[in-house]
């Protein structure tokens, strides 16, 4: 598998414009990225632009705080699927995890998994920068129990992004059959190679073109 086919080509900033989405989808077609990862408002346009392409549309749920109710997250998933999303990256209820309310954390994830079942792949963002190692392990275990397809490090909108150490811990926790996505601060081919070596099977990056072409990103970006 090429590096491009492991990358979710990402544009999640609040000021993202239509022109930027059109560029993102054009690049996805050109380079063969796994997906474009966009905010829900851009799912329909992205799906139209990628009609017939190998790249699919990924969107974010409960993003970036994870503090919506399970019911709202489930509705977001259904709406995104109606608009053409094939993958959804949800943020867990981080406060509930820290409160050790594992039942709520699981119910929250399961609401998304159930809404997406048979229609979209689910990635669960645990926001590693806000968690202890014990909490990272627990979050991954709950996500697997709830039926996720992937666990994912970060939103790119908090205090830190992906590290090889966190990827290795997540991979060890979920085993070989669940995907692990590294996101947040992955900007170069070298960054990607470190993440893959640690166990990542998907990369979230806004610098996808720079990564596959070996160029430096135009400017630093958290995502």
Swiss-Prot record:
The active site is at residues 89, 152, 181. It holds the Pfam family DeoC. GO terms for biological process: 2-deoxyribose 1-phosphate catabolic process; carbohydrate catabolic process; deoxyribonucleotide catabolic process. One of its GO terms (molecular function) is deoxyribose-phosphate aldolase activity. Keywords: Cytoplasm, Lyase, Schiff base. It catalyses: 2-deoxy-D-ribose 5-phosphate = D-glyceraldehyde 3-phosphate + acetaldehyde. Its EC number is 4.1.2.4. PANTHER family: DEOXYRIBOSE-PHOSPHATE ALDOLASE. Belongs to the DeoC/FbaB aldolase family. DeoC type 1 subfamily. Catalyzes a reversible aldol reaction between acetaldehyde and D-glyceraldehyde 3-phosphate to generate 2-deoxy-D-ribose 5-phosphate. This is Deoxyribose-phosphate aldolase. It comes from Listeria innocua serovar 6a (strain ATCC BAA-680 / CLIP 11262). The lineage of its organism: Bacteria, Bacillati, Bacillota, Bacilli, Bacillales.
């Amino acid at each position: 598998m090429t590096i491009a086919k492991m990358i979710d080509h990402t544009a999640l900033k609040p000021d993202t414009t239509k022109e930027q989405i059109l560029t993102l989808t054009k690049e996805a077609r050109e380079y063969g990225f796994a997906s474009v990862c966009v905010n829900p408002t851009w799912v329909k346009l992205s799906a139209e632009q990628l009609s017939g392409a190998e790249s699919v549309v990924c969107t974010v749920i409960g993003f970036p705080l994870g503090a919506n109710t399970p019911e709202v997250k489930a509705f977001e998933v259904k709406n995104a699927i109606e608009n053409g999303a094939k993958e959804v990256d949800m943020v867990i209820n981080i406060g509930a995890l820290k409160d050790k309310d594992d039942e709520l954390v699981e119910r929250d994830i399961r609401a998304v998994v159930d809404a997406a079942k048979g229609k979209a792949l689910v990635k669960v963002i645990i926001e590693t920068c806000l968690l202890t190692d014990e909490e990272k392990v627990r979050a991954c275990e709950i996500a697997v129990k709830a039926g996720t397809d992937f666990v994912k490090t970060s939103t790119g909108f908090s205090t830190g992004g992906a590290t090889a150490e966190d990827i290795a811990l997540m991979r060890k926790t979920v085993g070989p059959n669940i995907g692990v996505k590294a996101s947040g601060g992955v900007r170069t081919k070298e960054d990607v190679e470190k993440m893959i070596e640690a166990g990542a099977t998907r990369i979230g990056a806004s610098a996808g073109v720079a990564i596959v072409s070996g160029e430096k990103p135009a400017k630093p970006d958290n995502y």
